[in-house]
Regions:
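N-terminal glycine-/serine-/threonine-rich beta1-alpha1-beta2 phosphate-ribose binding loop
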Residues: 2-125
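Beta-strand-loop-alpha-helix segment that lines the small-molecule cofactor/substrate pocket
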Residues: 104-111, 117-155
């Protein structure tokens, strides 16, 4: 039996960004790769290296057909505002859980492995596929356990 698509409409995928930590600006990178970006806002807010490597590519090299980062949430609302402006994200939500029902999948682009299970848990429990960018546990012998996806998730 072939599993069904992970999202309702694979030709129109809505992604959410769930989090940012001070150690990395990957929410800017991921969002810019998917949505394109505002070079002025990006250079004002993201780490200089991000503007440098994004600027090395042509504007028409950004974007993924049928995919868009539509929502962002960050622990610090000011971070969410800056990422949204730099990466052309339409909607800022107040809580990570507010992404549920609004997006088809979430990106968790943080590198604090010890936080990943807690950050991913509400999405897994709701059947929203998370992409956790870094390993789930860098300070343990193995990853922190996540609950199994709900019955019927991804069908």
């Amino acid at each position: 039996m072939t599993p069904g698509p992970l999202v309702a409409d694979p030709s129109r995928v809505r992604l959410g960004i769930a989090g940012r930590v001070d150690e990395n600006d990957h929410p800017y990178s991921w969002s810019a790769i998917v949505n394109g970006y505002d070079p002025v806002a990006m250079s004002a807010h993201a780490h200089p290296m991000i503007s440098q490597y994004l600027g090395a590519r042509r504007a028409d090299e950004f974007g993924i057909e049928g995919v868009r980062v539509t929502h962002v949430w960050c622990d610090d609302p000011e971070d969410a505002r800056k990422i949204a402006g730099a990466s052309r994200i339409e909607t800022i939500v107040n809580r990570a859980e507010d992404l549920i029902g609004c997006v088809d999948a979430v990106l968790i682009p943080t590198d604090r492995g010890e936080e990943h299970a807690a950050r991913a848990r509400p999405f897994v429990e709701a059947g929203v596929p998370p992409l956790v960018e870094q390993p789930l546990g860098r300070h343990r012998p193995g990853p922190a356990p996540l609950p199994p996806p709900p019955a019927g998730a991804g069908k």
